[in-house]
Amino acid sequence: MKKIYRLLYSNKFVAMVMLLMQIITFVAMYIWISDYSKVLFGLSTVLSAVLIIFEINRTEESTFKMTWITLIAIIPIFGALFYLFTRAQGVSMNIGDDYKNIQEANKKYLVQDEDVMKNIYQTDKNQDGFARYLSKYGGSPAYTNTGVQYYSIGERMFEDMKKELLKAEKFIFLEFFIINHTSRMWNEILEILKKKVKQGVEVRVMYDGMGCIATLPRKYNEYLERQGIKCRIFSPIVPLLSTHQNNRDHRKIMVIDGATAFCGGINISDEYINEKMRFGHWKDTGFMLRGEAVAGFTAMFLEMWNVNDEHIENCGEYIQASKKYSVSTDGFVIPFGDTPLDEVYVGKRAYINNLNNASEYTYIMTPYLVIDDEMYECMKYAAQRGVDVKIIMPHIPDKKYAFYLARTYYKELLKAGIEIYEYTPGFVHAKMSISDGKKAIVGTVNHDYRSLYLHYECAAYMLNVPAVMDIERDFKDTLELSQKITLEDVKHFNIFTKILGHIIRLVAPLL
């Protein structure tokens, strides 16, 4: 009875009921309009034609265009109305304006050191331009004097997260897509946060409204506030049909005193540390920064924190705190964020840069593989140039529809000379790319439309840091545990899942 009561009063149940009622209403209106008269149907045909012409002439990735055109053409009235509904709303302008304003205010604390750029040029001339691109559009300069600790599994990262939290003296910032209040992982972190609040440490926690809809009870932010922890929910779920709720905060950031920062694929729930088995062994990755580059993640957190605030917070004290934690080490680190607020797809460009500038290899680990034409062509071109391109995917998926969709790309990628492997012990949730033993990207960005176009994401680009070799070693170790997929294997995939995957692919950019 208690379980039923909790379900009926949960965020997820209320939101689903309200959304279902709205969907039923829209479907009923659609049926009524479709049968009402030939005049209305004629008008809808004209509207569909106008919208198709409009979409063809938009500056947009071609796969998005084809999806919309197909939807409008096949289902004229519903497709046209859905298109207008989606395009009219776009990304929330309030969030966009707030984010850009705080980002502009923080620029004076994130000035690029030109000596660093000169050193990058001397180290690798091909990466100088890309480093400047990331510095301009990714929201953070390139840094030296930063130590990088790579984690090949969530359990090890969690242990170091706790150790660093216990060292906190001034502030702790947490920003996660998912926090599960019943998990051992969160409860151990929460106990440390409560302890630190009593010691006078400023603690801020931010989580995504959609990501936590089933893992946190209603008004959990108020509970945390009562513990002395400042808390905000990014884009709380409102039971109204709106495309604004499509843009989620998918970032995973932990910053302690400006001295250390953690990032990667790991959320705060027990499956990420293999305390709870859901899809076999959970393979995830992440990293800890210690030193000057931590400032980039501090700034990213504060930019999201200050969205919807009436007054822009002065973030200088927090961002500049990293200067005194400088670590003498080799290489360069560029923290970067990506948002749906512009048409600059930083995460996508970072992955493409690794492919286009590779001379020996590019290795990719991703839980989802839903790529557009440009990404496919870059992978194909790299393989045609003789670059060894390998992709590790899950063998046990968390979302079957996404897995069936990903497998529709296998045949064309294999024919292009790209090697695909599936991690047989379980689920790969790692998001990373490594190239030539020099360049690596680790963070929250999946190889799918949601991450590359729709979500708020973050990662770090690493050039010639010692940890890059750890990343390469981990990839090769994971490869040993993975099954190589061949064209013969693809032929024997279940026919029904293949058909379903290709049907889903028609609307992949909208998922």
Predicted segments with their positions:
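N-terminal localization/anchoring segments of enzymes in phospholipid and broader phosphate metabolism
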Residues: 1-349, 353, 357, 381, ...
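Surface segments flanking catalytic/ligand-binding clefts of nucleic-acid enzymes
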Residues: 419
